[in-house]
Amino acid sequence: KAIFDVYRNSFQPSYFMDQPKIITTYAVSVAETTEEAEYLSMPMQITRLNLMRGKLLNVLSPEEANDYPLTEMDKMILQQNRPLMLIGSAEEVVNQIKEEQEYFGFDEAMINCNLYTIDQRLNSYRLLAEQLNK
Protein backbone atom coordinates (compact mmCIF):
# COMPACT_ATOMS: atom_id res chain seq x y z
CA LYS A 1 0.00 0.00 0.00
CA ALA A 2 2.84 2.35 0.84
CA ILE A 3 4.25 2.23 -2.68
CA PHE A 4 0.88 3.27 -4.13
CA ASP A 5 0.69 6.15 -1.66
CA VAL A 6 4.19 7.29 -2.63
CA TYR A 7 3.23 7.12 -6.30
CA ARG A 8 0.04 9.13 -5.76
CA ASN A 9 1.79 11.75 -3.62
CA SER A 10 4.73 12.07 -6.02
CA PHE A 11 2.75 12.04 -9.25
CA GLN A 12 3.45 14.88 -11.66
CA PRO A 13 0.76 15.50 -14.29
CA SER A 14 1.99 15.33 -17.87
CA TYR A 15 0.80 15.41 -21.43
CA PHE A 16 0.13 11.66 -21.19
CA MET A 17 -1.61 11.51 -17.82
CA ASP A 18 -3.21 14.27 -15.81
CA GLN A 19 -3.88 12.07 -12.75
CA PRO A 20 -2.19 9.06 -11.19
CA LYS A 21 -3.65 5.74 -12.28
CA ILE A 22 -2.90 2.41 -10.64
CA ILE A 23 -3.47 -0.79 -12.57
CA THR A 24 -2.93 -4.19 -11.01
CA THR A 25 -2.92 -7.67 -12.51
CA TYR A 26 -4.14 -10.86 -10.90
CA ALA A 27 -3.30 -14.43 -11.86
CA VAL A 28 -6.52 -16.33 -11.22
CA SER A 29 -8.02 -19.78 -11.27
CA VAL A 30 -11.80 -19.65 -10.94
CA ALA A 31 -14.18 -22.59 -11.12
CA GLU A 32 -17.58 -23.64 -9.80
CA THR A 33 -15.96 -24.74 -6.53
CA THR A 34 -12.79 -23.84 -4.65
CA GLU A 35 -11.64 -27.44 -4.87
CA GLU A 36 -11.96 -27.47 -8.66
CA ALA A 37 -10.17 -24.11 -8.92
CA GLU A 38 -7.32 -25.48 -6.79
CA TYR A 39 -7.12 -28.57 -8.99
CA LEU A 40 -7.09 -26.49 -12.19
CA SER A 41 -4.45 -24.12 -10.79
CA MET A 42 -1.80 -26.80 -10.26
CA PRO A 43 -0.28 -26.54 -13.76
CA MET A 44 0.36 -22.82 -13.16
CA GLN A 45 1.78 -23.53 -9.73
CA ILE A 46 4.10 -26.29 -10.98
CA THR A 47 5.22 -24.07 -13.87
CA ARG A 48 6.11 -21.28 -11.43
CA LEU A 49 7.97 -23.76 -9.23
CA ASN A 50 10.01 -25.00 -12.20
CA LEU A 51 10.71 -21.47 -13.45
CA MET A 52 12.07 -20.59 -10.01
CA ARG A 53 14.54 -23.43 -10.54
CA GLY A 54 15.44 -22.26 -14.03
CA LYS A 55 13.64 -25.16 -15.67
CA LEU A 56 11.53 -24.62 -18.76
CA LEU A 57 9.19 -27.58 -19.06
CA ASN A 58 6.03 -28.10 -21.05
CA VAL A 59 2.93 -27.03 -19.19
CA LEU A 60 1.38 -30.03 -17.51
CA SER A 61 -2.28 -30.95 -17.70
CA PRO A 62 -4.22 -30.64 -14.43
CA GLU A 63 -4.07 -34.42 -14.09
CA GLU A 64 -0.29 -34.50 -14.61
CA ALA A 65 0.27 -31.50 -12.33
CA ASN A 66 -1.78 -32.98 -9.51
CA ASP A 67 0.20 -36.23 -9.82
CA TYR A 68 3.53 -34.37 -10.00
CA PRO A 69 5.98 -35.73 -7.41
CA LEU A 70 6.49 -32.94 -4.88
CA THR A 71 9.13 -32.93 -2.18
CA GLU A 72 8.39 -31.39 1.20
CA MET A 73 10.42 -28.37 0.08
CA ASP A 74 8.32 -28.11 -3.09
CA LYS A 75 5.16 -28.14 -0.99
CA MET A 76 6.54 -25.37 1.21
CA ILE A 77 7.43 -23.27 -1.83
CA LEU A 78 3.96 -23.79 -3.33
CA GLN A 79 2.44 -22.70 -0.03
CA GLN A 80 4.64 -19.59 0.05
CA ASN A 81 3.71 -18.76 -3.55
CA ARG A 82 -0.01 -19.31 -2.97
CA PRO A 83 -0.73 -15.63 -2.18
CA LEU A 84 0.55 -14.71 -5.65
CA MET A 85 -2.63 -16.15 -7.18
CA LEU A 86 -6.34 -15.81 -6.55
CA ILE A 87 -7.85 -19.28 -6.52
CA GLY A 88 -11.44 -20.14 -5.70
CA SER A 89 -15.06 -19.76 -6.66
CA ALA A 90 -16.06 -16.62 -8.55
CA GLU A 91 -17.61 -15.19 -5.40
CA GLU A 92 -14.43 -15.76 -3.36
CA VAL A 93 -12.14 -14.26 -6.00
CA VAL A 94 -14.36 -11.25 -6.69
CA ASN A 95 -14.67 -10.57 -2.95
CA GLN A 96 -10.89 -10.65 -2.59
CA ILE A 97 -10.38 -8.30 -5.53
CA LYS A 98 -12.98 -5.89 -4.13
CA GLU A 99 -11.38 -5.99 -0.67
CA GLU A 100 -7.98 -5.28 -2.15
CA GLN A 101 -9.38 -2.51 -4.36
CA GLU A 102 -10.86 -0.87 -1.28
CA TYR A 103 -7.61 -1.24 0.68
CA PHE A 104 -5.11 -0.33 -2.06
CA GLY A 105 -7.34 2.02 -4.05
CA PHE A 106 -6.25 0.81 -7.48
CA ASP A 107 -8.14 2.12 -10.48
CA GLU A 108 -8.18 -0.94 -12.68
CA ALA A 109 -7.60 -4.67 -12.33
CA MET A 110 -6.53 -6.94 -15.15
CA ILE A 111 -7.15 -10.67 -14.94
CA ASN A 112 -4.69 -13.26 -16.23
CA CYS A 113 -6.11 -16.76 -16.37
CA ASN A 114 -3.63 -19.30 -17.73
CA LEU A 115 -5.59 -22.46 -17.15
CA TYR A 116 -4.67 -25.51 -19.21
CA THR A 117 -7.45 -25.53 -21.81
CA ILE A 118 -9.18 -22.69 -23.58
CA ASP A 119 -12.53 -23.98 -22.30
CA GLN A 120 -11.27 -23.80 -18.70
CA ARG A 121 -10.03 -20.25 -19.30
CA LEU A 122 -13.29 -19.14 -20.90
CA ASN A 123 -15.31 -20.68 -18.08
CA SER A 124 -13.13 -18.93 -15.51
CA TYR A 125 -13.62 -15.55 -17.21
CA ARG A 126 -17.37 -16.21 -17.65
CA LEU A 127 -17.81 -17.05 -13.96
CA LEU A 128 -15.91 -13.92 -12.94
CA ALA A 129 -17.91 -11.72 -15.31
CA GLU A 130 -21.20 -13.10 -14.04
CA GLN A 131 -20.17 -12.51 -10.43
CA LEU A 132 -18.95 -8.99 -11.16
CA ASN A 133 -22.24 -8.14 -12.87
CA LYS A 134 -24.38 -9.16 -9.88
Language-model features, listed with the residues they occupy:
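Active-site-adjacent structural elements that line small-molecule/cofactor binding pockets in enzymes
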Residues: K1-K134
